Every structure is written in structure tokens, then in C-alpha cells.
Swiss-Prot record:
This is 6-phosphogluconolactonase. InterPro entries: 6-phosphogluconolactonase_YbhE (IPR022528), Cycloisomerase_2 (IPR050282), Lactonase_7-beta_prop (IPR019405), N2O_reductase_N (IPR011045), WD40/YVTN_repeat-like_dom_sf (IPR015943). Transmembrane segments: none annotated. GO terms for cellular component: cytosol. It catalyses: 6-phospho-D-glucono-1,5-lactone + H2O = 6-phospho-D-gluconate + H(+). Keywords: Carbohydrate metabolism, Glucose metabolism, Hydrolase. It comes from Salmonella arizonae (strain ATCC BAA-731 / CDC346-86 / RSK2980). It comes from the Bacteria.
Length: 331
């Protein structure tokens, strides 16, 4: 299995393309100059395309991924109804979802043969919309509205339209600020990192009564931390054993172990990392974590090791200015 790491640096309008080897070392493959401030990125389910959100002209760009080395070639673009904050796809590669914090909306763009061709739906009224996350069954879109302390729930129709579910939302505690999410591989639990109080909520997707329930909230900061809380990103290993979340003020990554059924998180440790870590990701083997420092203009690679999933730095690499997003492709 080959793995490619993509990093987005909006201040220098670049995507860096890296080859990741089995020892956790990166080799630079390509630097792509992007027509705009590149921020969120996602790889298509079939691994053939990289979708990128850019501003100030709000668009999603599609790049073809070379199967031999992961290099990018521009394919097409499609307009968006707001500044892209987060981008994702459904599991079948039919739709792109874009959350816009500034516009307070989530949009659905239809894909045809892997390329964005048509804006299908836009849902407004999501103040501080920070991500759009499709459930493993491809039926429900979870959309955190950070400024409203809620996660809106939508049913995705076959033609790409979003309809409010019943219930239409779940709520966090006041002032939490839900931001990014991941799902457990067993499809029973979701985890949401809350930006404003730097906590992680564990959501049971369906309890014995058929209801969505928050079963745990865990502080992700050290006990002696007293500065402003500013959490950013969250990811889980493919085997569901380890979960990680980062805070930008403290410039650290919190390491969690996950119970076998996915219902309970335990803090295992704290890893100092690049200055102001805005985004990170985990490789497809669950062996390496790659973090981007928005203020250090570097990325760092960590090995995930042991029963606790603690991190050991393997190397750091200069990228563009203000790196914000990391994605990993395997093929």
C-alpha cells in the first residue's frame, strides 16, 4: 500500500504532496500553487480525486490524483454559496458537503464521474457551521453549529437534498462550541471536539430506546491549564482503539484510549506539538499521525505506539505558510 500526505497552506496558497513510507518518513513529491487560499481538503472515496475548498472566491476545486505517486493535476471547479470551512463527501462518492462558518450554511454539490457539477441544496441558519459529517450508513449528516451549541441532524436523500431529522438536533452544554467529528468503526458512537471549552463529547448514535444520547464528556486539557481554550481537530485510528484531539492555544495533542465498545474515552497523555496545531490526520495503517502547525509553518510526523497510543516524533518538515489541513490517501 502506498500512502500520500497532502497539506494545505492558505497563506502561501499551496498544497504540498508527500510520499509517506513504512518508517514514517516523508519525501516531497510536488508543490501545487492553488488559485486562492486553500483550506479544507478531502479525498474522494475511490481515491481518484482531491477536493479542495478555496477563498476569497468561494469554490471547490477538483484535482486528479496520479495513481503512481499521488501527484495532483487540476480537473475542474464549482462555485460555493459561502466561504468553505470544512469539506467532506458521502461514502458513495456522489456528493460533496461543504460547511461555511461565516455564511452559517451547509451545501451539497453533486458529483458526476468524480467531478463537482451542480449545487443541489443549501441549508441556512447554522450559525458558526464548522463541519459536515456523514454517518457510516450514509444516511444522516451531522452538522455542528458552533455558535448555537448544537449539532443539526439531516437525512440525505438519494438525490442529495437534506431534510431535518426527528429530532432535528442534539445540544451540547452551553458555551461548548461543537466543531469537528469522527465516528467509531463499529458505527455505534460519534465523537465531537468542542472548540470553546476544549472538551470531547461521546454520542451514542442509538441507545436502547432508539435515541441519540451524549454518554460522556471529557476535558481534553491538562489539569493545570488556565489559558484560553481553543480546540481544533479530532481523529480516530482505523481500529478504533485510539483517539486524538488538538488545542491551538496549548499547542498540544491529547491522547485518548477508547473502550472496546467505543462508549468510554480515557485520557492517556498530552503530546506537545507544532505551534498552533489547526489540523492533523492519521495514516491508513493507524501507525502515524501528521500534525500541522499554523504558526510554525511545519508539519510533524509522530509514531503511534503501545497500548496507550502515545506519540513519538519521527520528523518535522517545512511546508507553506500557515498550514491548516492534512489528509492522507492510500492506494
Amino acid at each position: 500500500m502506498k500512502q500520500t500526505v497532502y497539506t494545505a497552506s492558505p497563506e502561501s496558497q499551496q498544497i504540498h504532496v508527500w510520499s509517506l513510507n513504512h518508517e514514517g518518513m516523508l519525501t516531497l513529491v510536488q508543490v501545487v500553487d492553488v488559485p486562492g487560499q486553500v483550506q479544507p481538503m478531502v479525498v474522494s472515496p475511490d481515491k481518484r480525486y482531491l477536493y479542495v475548498g478555496v477563498r476569497p472566491e468561494f469554490r471547490v476545486l477538483a484535482y486528479r490524483i496520479a495513481p503512481d505517486d499521488g501527484a495532483l493535476t487540476f480537473a475542474t471547479e464549482s462555485a460555493l454559496p459561502g466561504s468553505p470551512t470544512h469539506i467532506s463527501t458521502d461514502h458513495h462518492g456522489r456528493f460533496v458537503f461543504v460547511g461555511s462558518y461565516n455564511a452559517g450554511n451547509v451545501s451539497v454539490t453533486r458529483l458526476q464521474d468524480g467531478l463537482p457539477v451542480e449545487l443541489v441544496d443549501v441549508v441556512e441558519g447554522l450559525d458558526g457551521c464548522h463541519s459536515a459529517n456523514i454517518t457510516p450508513d450514509n444516511r444522516t449528516l451531522w452538522v455542528p453549529a458552533l455558535k448555537q451549541d448544537r449539532i443539526a441532524l439531516f437525512t440525505l436523500s438519494d438525490d442529495g437534498y437534506l431534510a431535518a431529522q426527528e429530532p432535528a438536533e442534539v445540544n451540547t452544554v452551553e458555551g461548548a462550541g461543537p466543531r469537528h467529528m469522527v465516528f467509531h468503526p463499529n458505527q455505534q458512537y460519534a465523537y465531537c471536539v468542542n472548540e470553546l471549552n476544549s472538551s470531547v463529547d461521546v454520542w451514542q448514535l442509538k441507545n436502547p430506546h432508539g435515541e441519540i444520547e451524549c454518554v460522556q464528556t471529557l476535558d481534553m486539557m491538562p489539569a493545570d491549564f488556565s489559558d484560553t481554550r481553543w480546540a481544533a481537530d479530532i481523529h480516530i485510528t482505523p481500529d478504533g482503539r485510539h483517539l486524538y484531539a488538538c488545542d491551538r492555544t496549548a499547542s498540544l495533542i491529547t491522547v485518548f484510549s477508547v473502550s472496546e465498545d467505543g462508549s468510554v474515552l480515557s485520557v492517556e497523555g498530552f503530546q506537545p506539538t507544532e505551534t498552533q496545531p489547526r489540523g492533523f490526520n492519521i495514516d491508513h495503517h493507524g501507525k502515524y499521525l501528521i500534525a500541522a502547525g499554523q504558526k510554525s509553518h511545519h508539519i510533524a510526523v509522530y509514531e503511534i505506539a503501545g497500548a496507550q497510543g502515545l506519540l513519538t516524533e519521527k520528523g518535522r518538515y517545512a511546508v507553506g505558510q500557515g498550514p491548516m489541513w492534512v489528509v492522507v490517501n492510500a492506494y
